[in-house]
Amino acid sequence: MASKVYFSKTITAEKVLQMYTLLGKQLPGKVAIKVHSGEEGNQNFLRPDFWKPVVDHVGGTVVECNTAYPGQRNTTKKHLKLFETHGWSRYFTVDLLDAEGPDLVLDIPGGKVIQKNYVGKDLMNYDSLLVLSHFKGHPMGGYGGALKQLSIGIASAHGKAYIHGAGEPAKIWTANQDDFKRSMADAAMSVVE
């Protein structure tokens, strides 16, 4: 069966909500809305005011996880401050899924590279997941988007190093890139199943 593709020349918050409602999908239970908070000083992140109609429509909570590398997103305190700086906290409740450990370990029985995924334990508090992504070139993952949001984005700080290192966190920046990409696919599979 062919997939339906929706396209609009008009890009507004109202048009995105209209297109979402065309899907006719109801997300059951408590909804996590995965976003990328954006890096400090960078303008390449989704704007919270643009997504407010969709978030309000599904009644979701904005979620994210801390990073595995130094910066303004590697601790809960700094990351929440960045969410505030970028405007997310002005509109929404933000839940950092890995704010407190221990990690939730998801099995990946059919994983091609990794057989476990380490995610923020607060993921267990949600019944549904809506991923909001912006497409971008990424130096390690090829492209950043929904697959990266479902894998690296849901992973705890340790989980991010585990995925980047293709199962060996110490190789976070040196693992084979094809194995890293396969690890991302494995991790994403564990989140959606």
Segments and roles (model prediction):
Residues 1-193:
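N-terminal and secondary-structure boundary signal
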